[in-house]
């Protein structure tokens, strides 16, 4: 089995026709473009699209599984064919930047795959309750994160999945996200600024490694749906909004240490250069109902990193120094999933 360092040279191929042929034989290699050439992971542990750009459009679907005689069989069929379904769309629309990720909740993993061990940090998310704010815990068995430049392709893939799960799963939540003004959240600031840079190798932060070898190449996926109080937010002067976020609004430059409050969003969520996650957040809205929000989705090789960030946001470090952004943004969901490597996905679907 060739290592990723050997196949990474394919990224340098200039001939577009050859690239398309190679893409057919090397599943998904062009959608996971942030993998470092020195990675120790081999093709056996090839990850799903966990380091991808958030994209122009996204659909997030959380399903709850029904207790039927066909549930395990139908879900396993989705697992077995997931990679092929993705490649089918990618091959037909090579410029659409299509990708999709499948994750499992803790209860679903145990029920669907009773002979499999559980990843070390896969658990039912326990709510985090601070004095002012709560990171709620909500149910979810399957997560589909679908991205593309074309919303029509997201819809096509989602409809295929929904048909395959007919009779064995019910939708808990479906949210459609969109890219806003060059990557800004609806509150007007660039989102994802704190993501690892390419030269930091985002892969090392997003993907499980040798610490849990049976699940190497997988990723812990945590999602929250935040609703923004835009009336309260828009009542703040720009300078005050900048203190809430910790960055200048119009050029995205970080405030100096002298300017930045201790409870600024980027101060509270910074838990160290070695403890990062890969975010792919997207704005969503229902303007006629006055609903505006951010769908937070974070991929991590260690969920403990994500949880530490959440504890600092909702409880504070020290206690009480909570994220001021939470005064304007309220999470109404909170669910943890595990996204296996493509190899493991095929194995559990067998």
Question: Where in this protein do the model-derived segments appear?
Answer:
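N-terminal mitochondrial targeting presequence
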Residues: 1-13, 18-31
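Long, histidine/aromatic-enriched segments associated with O2/redox biology
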Residues: 31, 41-350
């Amino acid at each position: 089995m060739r290592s990723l360092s050997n196949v990474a040279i394919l990224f340098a191929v200039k001939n577009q026709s050859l690239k398309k042929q190679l893409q057919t034989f090397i599943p998904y290699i062009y959608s996971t473009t942030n993998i470092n050439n020195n990675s120790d992971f081999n093709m056996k542990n090839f990850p799903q699209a966990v380091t991808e750009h958030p994209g122009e459009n996204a659909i997030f679907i959380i399903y709850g599984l029904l207790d039927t005689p066909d549930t395990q069989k139908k879900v396993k069929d989705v697992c077995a064919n997931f990679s092929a379904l993705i490649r089918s769309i990618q091959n037909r629309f090579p410029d659409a930047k299509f990708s999709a990720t499948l994750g499992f909740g803790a209860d679903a993993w145990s029920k669907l795959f009773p002979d499999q061990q559980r990843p070390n940090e896969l658990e039912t998310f326990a709510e985090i309750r601070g004095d002012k704010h709560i990171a709620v815990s909500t149910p979810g068995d399957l997560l589909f994160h679908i991205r593309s430049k074309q919303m029509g392709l997201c819809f096509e893939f989602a409809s295929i999945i929904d048909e395959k799960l007919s009779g064995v799963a019910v939708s808990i939540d479906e949210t459609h996200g969109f890219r806003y003004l060059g990557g800004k959240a609806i509150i007007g600031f660039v989102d994802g600024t704190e993501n690892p840079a390419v030269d930091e190798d985002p892969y090392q932060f997003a993907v499980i490694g040798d610490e849990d070898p049976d699940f190497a190449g997988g990723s812990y996926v945590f999602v929250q749906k935040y609703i923004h109080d835009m009336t309260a937010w828009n009542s703040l002067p720009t300078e005050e909004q900048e203190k809430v976020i910790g960055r200048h609004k119009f050029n995205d430059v970080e405030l100096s240490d002298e300017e930045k409050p201790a409870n600024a969003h980027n101060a509270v969520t910074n838990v160290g250069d070695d403890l990062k996650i890969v975010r792919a957040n997207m704005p969503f809205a229902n303007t006629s109902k006055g609903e505006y929000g951010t769908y937070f989705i974070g991929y991590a090789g260690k969920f403990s990193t994500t949880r530490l960030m959440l504890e600092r946001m909702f409880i504070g470090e020290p206690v009480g120094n909570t994220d001021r952004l939470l005064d304007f943004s309220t999470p109404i969901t909170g669910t943890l999933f595990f996204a296996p490597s493509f190899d493991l996905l095929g194995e559990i679907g067998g």
